[in-house]
Amino acid sequence: MSEFNETKFSNNGTFFETEEPIVETKSISVYTPLIYVFILVVSLVMFASSYRKKQAKKISEQPSIFDENDAHDLYFQIKEMSENEKIHEKVLKAALLNRGAESVRRSLKLKELAPQINLLYKNGSIGEDYWKRFETEVKLIELEFKDTLQEAERLQPGWVQLFVMVCKEICFNQALSRRYQSILKRKEVCIKEWELKINNDGRLVN
C-alpha cells in the first residue's frame, strides 16, 4: 500500500516515480570579489587618466590671448639640439628659467585681469566665448608652469623650490627693465614732439 502511494500516474496511464532536482553547488574563492574590485578600480583610473589627457589636449588647442610664447619655443629648440649636440647644462637651465619666468608673468597678468573680466562677464559686456577663452588661458598657464617644474626636477632633482624663486626674480627684473625702456621711449617721443634740447647729462637746455 505504501509503495502504491509513493507512485504517481501520468495522464496517459503510465506511472513514474517522483525525483527531487539535484542542486549543483560550486565553491568560489574568497579572492574573486577582490579581483573584480581591483579590475573596476583600475578601469576607473584608466578612464580618468584618459579623460584628463583629452581635456588637456582640448584646452591646448584653444587660441591664446597672449602673443607667441618665444621662451617656450626657445627652450624646446635648445632641448632638441641637445639630443644631437653637446650643449652645456647651464644653457638648458637658463632657457628653462626664462620659460618659467614667462609663465609667472602671464599668470600674474591673468590674476590682475580676473576681477575686471568677471565684472564685465556678469554685466554682459563680454560674451560666453571670451569668458571661456579667458578660463582656458588660465588653465593653459597652470599646465605650462607645472610642466616647467617637472622639467626642473628632471634636470636637477630637488631644484624645484629654488627654481620657483629664481623664476619670480627674473620676472620682476624683466618687468622693471620693460618699465625703464618704456620711460626712455616716452622721453624720446616728448623730446621730438616738443622740440626739446637735452645735453649729455640728460638735462634740459634753454
From Swiss-Prot:
Main subcellular location: endoplasmic reticulum
Topology term for the membrane: Single-pass type II membrane protein
Membrane-spanning parts: 28-48
UniProt keyword annotation of Protease present: no
Lumenal side: 1-27
InterPro entries: Sec66 (IPR018624)
Pfam family of the protein (one): Sec66
One GO cellular component, as annotated: rough endoplasmic reticulum membrane
Compartments, as annotated in UniProt: Endoplasmic reticulum membrane
Domain of life: Eukaryota
Positions annotated as glycosylated: N5, N12
One biological process term in Gene Ontology: filamentous growth
Cytoplasmic side: 49-206
UniProt KW keywords: Endoplasmic reticulum, Glycoprotein, Membrane, Protein transport, Signal-anchor, Transmembrane, Transmembrane helix, Transport
PANTHER family to which the protein is assigned, alphabetical: TRANSLOCATION PROTEIN SEC66
Further comment: Present with 7820 molecules/cell in log phase SD medium.
Role description: Acts as a component of the Sec62/63 complex which is involved in SRP-independent post-translational translocation across the endoplasmic reticulum (ER) and functions together with the Sec61 complex and KAR2 in a channel-forming translocon complex. A cycle of assembly and disassembly of Sec62/63 complex from SEC61 may govern the activity of the translocon. SEC66 is required to attach or retain SEC72 in the SEC63 complex. It is essential for growth at elevated temperatures.
The family this protein is said to belong to: To S.pombe SpBC409.21.
Oligomer and partners: Component of the heterotetrameric Sec62/63complex composed of SEC62, SEC63, SEC66 and SEC72. The Sec62/63 complex associates with the Sec61 complex to form the Sec complex. Part of a complex consisting of KAR2, SEC63, SEC66 and SEC72.
Protein name per the record: Translocation protein SEC66
Primary gene name: SEC66
